[in-house]
Amino acid sequence: MGTSSGSNHPHQMLPPRQQQRSGGGLETALSLVSSDQEPRRESPAESASSQETWPLGDTVAGKKSMSQKTEPDSMEQTVNVMHHVSNADKVSVRDIARERVELVAERMHRLPDEFLDELKNGLKSILEGNVAQSVDEFMFLQKVVQSRTDLSSVTLVRAHRVQLEILVAINTGIQAFLHPNISLSQPSLIEIFVYKRCRNIACQNQLPADDCYCDICTNRKGFCNLCMCTICNKFDFSVNTCRWIGCDLCSHWTHTDCAIRDGQITTGSSAKNNTSGPGEIVFKCRACNRTSELLGWVKDVFQHCAPNWDRESLMKELDFVSRIFRGSEDQRGRKLFWKCEELIDKIKGGLAEATAAKLILMFFQEIESDSAKSFENGEGGRLMAPQDACNRIAEVVQETLRKMEIVAEEKMRMFKKARMALETCDRELEDKAKEVSELKAERQKKKLQIDELERIVRLKQAEADMFQLKANEAKREADRLQRIVLAKMDKSEEEYASNYLKQRLSEAEAEKQYLFEKIKLQENSRVASQSSGGGGDPSQVMMYSKIRDLLQGYNLSPKVDPQLNERNPFRSNP
């Protein structure tokens, strides 16, 4: 924790692990990972780094390479490789957790790298899973590993590297040990497994850290006082923040949320600052059971870090301080609580974060000056020298002028901001008025176009009606002409049939006359031959008689019915 407002501590205890940020690449949170592995069982999301967020840079490329392994081509290649591995040589995560180290290591040496990567990915999916099945599987694996007595630094030396990474990931619940871009040495992995090295990859200190042999560092397996909370046993990478509280006396760190929740932040007097009142907010360290005042620590954090905070970070830090001093009974703590609440409201209303940071720093200066005044008045109220009084008055005047300048600058900035907003509104109104006039003109234009289209539609409708009337008349004329044509065709067919029959009848009469004359001639010649020579052939005479009778009968037959010839006008006579 930071120094008090009146102390001159040799180094400023800013939030934890500031000295480690420059050395490691993993600066963002691997989640808050618990080190209390014995009585309490947590889900992978609580005890493991299943919510880890990797930093930018090479580690992001590592994550991309991991995602590329899940593509179809890579998966198909992995499946093909796994098909070539016999069932006797295959190793599962449960085998690694249950079976002897040397037996599993011997089998894993015969396995291809693709199969080992698939094995690590399977465990990662279990650690990442939030479903009950994944949680139960992780709890089972962790229980099996932690219940084994043969896993020591001696036996783990013979382990395969992937086997050791899987065992460490199961034991700690941190999937970062399975990441391809994080490669720790085998001795480091063994020390992490047996709780002799901090499992925080960005810390990696030997345990106990700083040769601390307090109850917490001694009795909690894997606890590191440089990066882990004394209450929840988890670590993260938050620095330059009020999220962590450090003890002035033993330098152990605690989450502010955990301290508030467990009642470690309370009212009392500090063991280090005898000038603190009985109602001042103090922090009671769980490691050394001693108290440290928090007002000076908050002041130190804001003096060193507030200028670098953005808007969201500043609001979060003010909220932390407000929650810390909510129950304060002394005047300074109550003023700080009210000031934080006021600044949070102003920032939400549009106050710039730089101005808010200046105001809170000025507030701390006021509190310090008020404390100095109270201390001077408490020493008997001795009279000040004229020069000191003048200097003090000058300081007060300068401080007042500085405050007035800041307020004036803020008001001027707000005035300029309001004026710019007003000008923007005026421009927007002008633009909207132009848009309205354009819309009206466009609407009038559209209305004229609609009227023109309606007129054209009416004209086209009238033309269509006219053409329809003409079409009806043309159709009636066509029907009349068709009836005339049909009547003329019927009449011409009748005339043709009558003429044809008359022609055929005349031809038949001529032929009959011809035949009759021929028969008559033959009969005359026959009669002449009979008179001259005697009788003729009786059969021939009979034939001529029949022919004559037929011709006479044909001459007496009735006329042909014209209706029959109409139905078949081109029929030949028999």
Swiss-Prot record:
Molecular function terms, GO-annotated: identical protein binding; zinc ion binding
GO biological process, one term: primary root development
Observed effect of gene inactivation: No visible phenotype. When associated with OBE1 disruption, plants exhibit premature termination of the shoot meristem and impaired root apical meristem establishment, leading to a diminutive phenotype characterized by an absence of roots and defective development of the vasculature.
Cell location: Nucleus
One of the Pfam families matching this protein, by short name: PHD_Oberon
Expression induction or repression: By auxin in the root elongation zone.
UniProt note on tissues of expression: Expressed in roots, seedlings, stems, leaves, flowers and siliques, especially in the vasculature.
Source organism, top-level taxon: Eukaryota
InterPro entries the UniProt entry points to: OBE1-like_PHD (IPR047578), OBERON (IPR004082), Oberon-like_PHD (IPR032881), Oberon_cc (IPR032535), Znf_PHD (IPR001965)
CC per GO annotation: nucleus
Quaternary structure and partners: Self-interacts. Interacts with OBE1, OBE3 and OBE4. Binds to VPg of pea seed borne mosaic virus (PSbMV), turnip mosaic virus (TuMV) and lettuce mosaic virus (LMV), but not with VPg of tobacco etch virus (TEV), cowpea mosaic virus (CPMV), tomato black ring virus (TBRV) and grapevine fan leaf virus (GFLV).
Functional note: Probable transcription factor that acts together with OBE1 for the maintenance and/or establishment of both the shoot and root meristems, probably by controlling the expression of the meristem genes such as WUS, PLT1 and PLT2 and of genes required for auxin responses. Promotes cell meristematic activity via the WUSCHEL-CLAVATA pathway. Involved in the development of the basal pole and in auxin-mediated root and vascular development in the embryo. Confers sensitivity to turnip mosaic virus (TuMV) probably by promoting viral movement and multiplication via interaction with TuMV VPg.
Protein name according to UniProt: Protein OBERON 2
Organism from which the protein derives: Arabidopsis thaliana (Mouse-ear cress)
Upper taxonomic lineage: Eukaryota, Viridiplantae, Streptophyta, Embryophyta, Tracheophyta
